[in-house]
Every structure is written in structure tokens, then in C-alpha cells.
Curated annotation (Swiss-Prot):
The keyword Secreted applies. Its main location: secreted. Expressed by the venom gland. It comes from Centruroides tecomanus (Scorpion). It is found in: Secreted. This is Beta-toxin Ct25. One of its GO terms (biological process) is defense response.
Length: 83
């Protein structure tokens, strides 16, 4: 029983350490893409994400499973383009 509780607690803690979002480039903007997921998947995995894809409607890479220390784009704190 104790082992089961330990496993469940471990899974919950692992989930807390990951986030999803649009990674930012050096200028604070989303990483742009047009078509295909290979570029975004590579960019996201370089940031230690589990995967990434090109969200075509936003023309930007979206990463899943990013570490907490990676900054992601947020419309509320958008500094892209000197805003």
C-alpha cells in the first residue's frame, strides 16, 4: 500500500514540473513557423520539452512538457517588438 501511495505521489510531482506554451525567442516573441511540425519539435526538444508542433492558426511553435524554468509567451506580459 505504501508503495502505491509513493508511486501516485511521484506521478503528481512529475506533472507539476512541466508546462505547455509558446516558447519565446531572444526578442520576447513567439518562435514563428508556417507549416510542418519538424522545426518546432526540434526547437522545443532543444528546450527540454517532450514535444512541439506548429500551431498554424497562430503561426507559432507550441511546446508540451517544458521545464518550469523556460519562459513562455504570455499576452498579458507581451514584450515582443518593444511593446
Amino acid at each position: 500500500m505504501k508503495v502505491l501511495i509513493l508511486i501516485i505521489a511521484s506521478v503528481l510531482l512529475i506533472g507539476v514540473e512541466c508546462k505547455d506554451g509558446y516558447p519565446k525567442n531572444s526578442e520576447g516573441c513567439k518562435i514563428s513557423c508556417v507549416i510542418g511540425n519538424t522545426f518546432c519539435d526540434t526547437e522545443c526538444k532543444m528546450l527540454k520539452a517532450s514535444s512541439g508542433y506548429c500551431w498554424t492558426l497562430g503561426l507559432a511553435c507550441y511546446c508540451e512538457g517544458l521545464p518550469e524554468n523556460v519562459e513562455v509567451w504570455d499576452s498579458a506580459t507581451n514584450k515582443c517588438g518593444g511593446k
